[in-house]
UniProtKB/Swiss-Prot annotation:
Localisation per UniProt entry: Cytoplasm
Gene name linked to the record: pnp
NCBIfam families the record matches: polynuc_phos, PRK11824.1
EC supergroup of this enzyme: transferase
Gene3D superfamilies: GHMP Kinase, N-terminal domain, K Homology domain, type 1, Nucleic acid-binding proteins
Protein name per Swiss-Prot or TrEMBL: Polyribonucleotide nucleotidyltransferase
Domain S1 motif: 624-692
Role this protein plays: Involved in mRNA degradation. Catalyzes the phosphorolysis of single-stranded polyribonucleotides processively in the 3'- to 5'-direction.
Species assigned in the record: Bartonella tribocorum (strain CIP 105476 / IBS 506)
Length: 731
């Protein structure tokens, strides 16, 4: 019934299996990939023909994690998987980026790649396996895909590169780098690092590229026995149109690209494009030799040819800069004084307002991942409204691009954050892109670094980012620093590098062509380092390190630790005690399983009141200490005072005042607030308090009362015996 084909190899000490022909046979391509005991199913379906007037390649990649893969039922009311998580979106992009450039130019059939994690062993991360399975399914499908590609993860532990480290090894690694490529070229890199130098990062890329070669061989072997016949697809021959357009418009396009202002340049190019379309489009459709889509495609190709040629020939950029110059930078902090921290970062025509907010444990984000529930204390959100590029558009939930750019900036900042123990706040940074002409994600990195320091977050060092580009024609190439939007779209590489003065914290690279050599990447990294140091120096004009004090509008958090067996006492039955503390003091209180208690409030007095309350529950009263209490009951022989949490003690009638007292209610009544001193414990372990030992107006000890001194001497003699009696009673 099934005609299956299977390839198995040993890869980084674990078996990798690729199988096809048994599952999802109606898809154009389907592969079950297994690594260790993690299993994914990748399918590819591509429409037989493009939609009418389709002017782009509609590729969609959907990566989805099934709860049953780890033996769990989804949470929530519906008990089923719903909208993609942030991680699913990021992995979808991770797969999309290296495969998209490998489709034959001009192919515009609707194509969908769906990858499902159907089993997870909690040891092998499924993202690399999903990338491999997607590539294999595309290679088998017959669509015009010039692959295969493969991916690998690289760690860096104890000075050694590690290929595909287990998930539990990653916390000890100074590097988390994912590389994807073909047999001859690296196509994509995504990484987070602990301030590693450029040579270590480049070595990791090359190590990963070498490590993925056996997987490429396995995919090719599978394709040799299981691939479908290639589809009949011949790219359109538009050479006649290209020649005619070049004669008609080349000089006008060159003139338009001498305009340095982005909006003016775009207006000139759009007007020229409209003029050319009108010239090539006759009045009647029957006489049309070329479609609007074909004309627009060739126009873009001519733009790229002119811009790229100018840069290679003159070493000058669209805006007049040389290859390594960074655009003018202006940094400001505290632009929104009532927020906890804020910054405005402007680099040329790219600008970001970044606002930092400090929160408590209640603000931590709970993330329900396949590996289990965990809490995230650092959030970075990137917003890209349409007005930032002078356009109209929809507003709503963030798209894949916004999520991806935000995560890149998160990776850049994350290694420099203080530990949770030294800075127990939840941190949220929001980047609002207000202008964009290239590298808004790196502007987010710079702005976030400044905003966090403005908020008083003690970053280990400031972080900056820069986007690099590449123009390559044959043996000639030019590496560009701080690229514009046009240089990104018309170039061969988008290479983003973020880090401190000491090293790289995040690196993202997308390459659109083959032939990017190790030497070119080395030049790009060194040039990026120079640019990064320059940007850090410009940022230092606004702020060099974290402010010593938090904003007056920030919450204050104090941390205390109690014994684990005392947690129940602080919480109380059904949460009664902790609710009362919160309601009465106004503080926010978070209790962790290890006995760590975080008390938060903007008011120091509120925090102190909550601390005293908690200490009164978990601590033992100290002999000789003075407490403020409340009279809860009076009797002929004295008054009972609630003085330490729920603990009551007796003030004997002889200890109510220095003078002789004949009636308790002459001195105190129920509900009165009084100061008492803990004198000790009687023979039965009962608390003995004194009011006459304390000045009731100031709460300070009365040192001139002879009877108090005598009482103190007697208590000091009795304390050892009383402690023995209490211990015996407890036993």
């Amino acid at each position: 019934m099934f005609k299956t084909h299977k390839i198995e190899i040993e890869w980084a000490g674990r078996p990798l299996t690729l199988e096809t022909g048994k599952i999802a046979r109606q898809a154009d391509g389907a592969v079950i990939a297994t690594y260790g005991e993690t299993i994914v199913l990748a399918t590819v379906v591509s429409a037989k023909s493009p939609k009418p007037d389709q002017d782009f390649f509609p590729l969609t990649v959907n990566y989805q994690e099934k709860s049953y893969a780890v033996g769990r039922i989804p949470g929530g009311y519906l008990k089923r998987e719903s909208r993609p998580s942030e991680n699913e979106t990021l992995v979808s992009r991770l797969i999309d980026r290296p495969i998209r450039p490998l489709f034959v130019e001009g192919y515009k059939n609707d194509t969908q790649v769906i990858v499902s994690v159907i089993q997870h062993d909690l040891e092998n991360n499924p993202d690399i396996l999903a990338m491999i399975a997607s590539s294999a399914a595309l290679t088998l499908s017959g669509v015009p895909f010039m692959g295969p590609i493969a991916g690998a993860r690289v760690g860096y532990c104890n000075g050694q590169y590690v290929l595909n480290p287990h998930m539990d090894e990653m916390p000890e690694s100074k590097l988390d780098l994912v590389v994807a490529g073909t047999e001859s070229a690296v196509l994509m890199v995504e990484s987070e690092a602990q301030e590693l130098p450029e040579d270590i990062m480049l070595g990791a890329v090359m190590f990963g590229h070498k490590g993925l070669q056996p997987v490429l061989d396995a995919i090719i072997k599978l394709a040799e026995v299981a691939a479908k016949d290639p589809r009949d697809f011949v790219p359109e021959d538009l050479s006649d149109l290209e020649k005619a357009m070049q004669e008609m418009a080349e000089q006008d396009i060159r003139k338009a690209y001498t305009i340095t202002d982005k909006q003016e340049r775009y207006a000139a190019i759009d007007a020229l494009k409209t003029e050319i379309i009108n010239k090539f489009m006759p009045e009647t459709e029957e006489d049309c030799q070329f479609s609007t889509d074909q004309i627009a495609t060739v126009f873009k190709q001519l733009q790229a040819k002119i811009v790229r040629g100018n840069i290679l020939d003159t070493k000058k950029r669209i805006d007049g800069r040389n290859l390594s110059t960074v655009r003018p930078i202006q940094s400001e902090v505290s632009i929104l004084p009532r927020t906890h921290g804020s910054a405005l970062f402007t680099r040329g025509e790219t600008q970001a307002i970044v606002v930092a907010t400090l929160g408590t444990g209640e603000d931590e984000q709970y993330i329900d991942a396949l590996t289990g529930m965990y809490k995230e204390t650092f959030l970075l959100h990137y917003n890209f409204p349409p007005f930032s590029v002078g356009e109209t558009g929809r507003l709503g939930s963030p798209g894949r691009r916004e999520i991806g750019h935000g995560k890149l900036a998160w990776r850049a900042i994350h290694p420099m954050l203080p530990t949770k123990e030294s800075f127990p706040y939840t941190i949220r940074a929001v980047s609002e892109i207000t202008e964009s002409n290239g590298s808004s994600s790196m502007a987010t990195v710079c702005g976030t670094s400044l905003a966090l320091m403005d908020a008083g977050v003690p970053l280990a060092r400031p972080v900056a980012g820069i986007a690099m580009g590449l123009i390559k024609e044959g043996e000639r190439f030019a590496v560009l620093s701080d690229i514009l939007g046009d240089e990104d779209h018309l170039g061969d590489m988008d290479f983003k590098v973020a880090g401190t003065e000491n090293g790289i914290t995040a690196l993202q690279m997308d390459i659109k062509i083959d032939g990017i050599t190790e030497e070119i990447m080395k030049i790009a990294l060194e040039q990026a380092k120079d640019g990064r140091i320059h940007i850090l120096n410009e940022m230092a004009k606004a702020l060099t390190s974290a402010r010593a004090e938090l904003s007056e509008f920030s919450p204050r958090i104090e941390v205390i630790n109690i014994a684990v067996d005392k947690i129940r006492d602080v919480i109380g039955s059904g949460g009664k005690v902790i609710r009362e503390i919160v309601e009465q003091t106004g503080a926010k209180i978070n209790i962790e399983d290890d006995g760590t208690i975080k008390i938060a409030s903007a008011d120091a007095k509120t925090i102190e009141a909550a601390k005293r309350w908690i200490h009164s529950i978990v601590d033992e009263p100290e002999v000789g200490a003075i407490y403020q209490g409340t009279v809860v009951k009076t009797a002929d022989f004295g008054a009972f005072i609630n003085f330490f949490g729920s603990r009551d003690g007796l003030v004997h009638i002889s200890q109510l005042a220095s003078e002789r007292v004949t009636k308790t209610t002459d001195i105190v009544k129920e509900g009165d607030k009084v100061w008492v001193k803990l004198m000790g414990f009687d023979e039965r372990g009962k608390v003995r308090l004194s009011m006459k030992a304390v000045d009731q107006k100031t709460g300070k000890e009365m040192t001139d009362d002879k009877s108090v001194k005598e009482e103190k001497c007697m208590d000091e003699k009795k304390q050892p015996e009383n402690k023995r009696r209490r211990k015996k009673k407890e036993e």
